Amino acid sequence: MRDMIKKENKLCFQHRMERKTEKSFQLSAGRQRLLAETIRELKQEGRLDEEKLAMQHGTTSIYRHSLNVAYTSLWMMERWQIRLEPKSLVRGALLHDYFLYDWHQKDSSHRLHGFRHPKTALGNAQRDYHLNWKEKNIIARHMFPLIPVPPQCREAWIVCLADKWCALGETMEPMFHVKHFK
């Protein structure tokens, strides 16, 4: 009987913690709207949907990874109460890996992908969209410190951090069967 009570208490605690985590990782309605509108705009103007065709980390597509980074960046901005340009933050986050190829395929052009893809992503994004300076900086500098030139604006620093956090979660997810994002 005692073991059953302990097990029930443990399950209740886990459920409370999951609910608390879900609530604490939610965006305000306004930020959710901004994210949805920006995704819609980028899909209409360019080739954002092509990111669905290739995987990024583990079982996560490049598209899903970009959404995760954009969401996490907005969450960090809200949670830490950092003054940023939310639209630039979201656009830069959604386009930071806009390189439009499957880097897992055996192809000599994909060698040193980690070092080269920010430049490719920036070139593709500039061809398909009108970018401001912050959005360009986000895309070009998100691989710091692998690429030793640091971000130059707060938005780029936040996306750089969010990218590392999401990449870790997405890579570890299949190993531990833990859902990083819904």
Describe the predicted segments one by one.
Residues M1-K182:
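Metal-dependent phosphohydrolase cores
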